[in-house]
Amino acid sequence: MPAEQYKEHPLKLFGYCPRCGSNHFGINDFKSKKCGDCGFIFYFNPIAATVAVIVNEKNELLVARRAKEPAKGTLDLPGGFTDSFETAEEGVSREVTEETGLAVKETRYLFSLPNKYIYSGFEEHTMDLFFLCKVEGEALTPADDVEELRWIPMEDVVPEEFGLQSIGKGIEKLKTIYKTI
């Protein structure tokens, strides 16, 4: 991401070197800080997150309504952050089970989109990895940070109803390719 897209330095809240604890931790470039004492450079890189695209035999997309901020009350797709030592495929499968009660039996990578995600007042930059997921079972159980789950015919899905920017853009992209996935 070019430097001009940042409104302020992404590490402005980080005042101490994570390696040695020094407060001589200054801006190195548009996405990193460098310690003036030990020389450590800390880069601000995106966090991996996954998004599940689940389409049933009626060409309906499984959507969730967010129960928590950010974008509480808006539509979303199942998914979330990957855990350490977890593959993206394992992460999307775990998130689908946590949020819907469904078991994923197959995943296929579709595409990725960058996103900004506000968590506890801090702007996280994520790389959202979209996966087509085939699931077992039909009983939907909204849980974790999901208020409601429902199936919407793909042709009726409106990108603007999705609260997170990357999900809305992903829906736009899906609507152009969903007949081929």
Would you name each region that the model predicts?
Residues 4-7, 56-98:
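Conserved Nudix-box catalytic region and its N-terminal flanking loop in Nudix hydrolases
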Residues 111-139:
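Active-site-adjacent beta-strand/loop module that shapes the phosphate/pyrophosphate-binding cleft
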Residues 26-32:
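Short linker/helix segments within small regulatory modules
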Residues 1-13, 139-181:
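Nudix hydrolase/Nudix homology domain
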Residues 17-20, 35-38:
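Short cysteine-rich clusters marking metal-coordination/redox-active sites
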Residues 25-26, 43:
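Short functional micro-motifs and their immediate structural scaffolds
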Residues 37-61, 81:
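Conserved N-terminal beta-strand and adjoining loop/helix that marks the start
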Residues 10-14, 31, 48:
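Short metal-coordination and nucleic-acid-contact micro-motifs, chiefly zinc-binding Cys/His arrays
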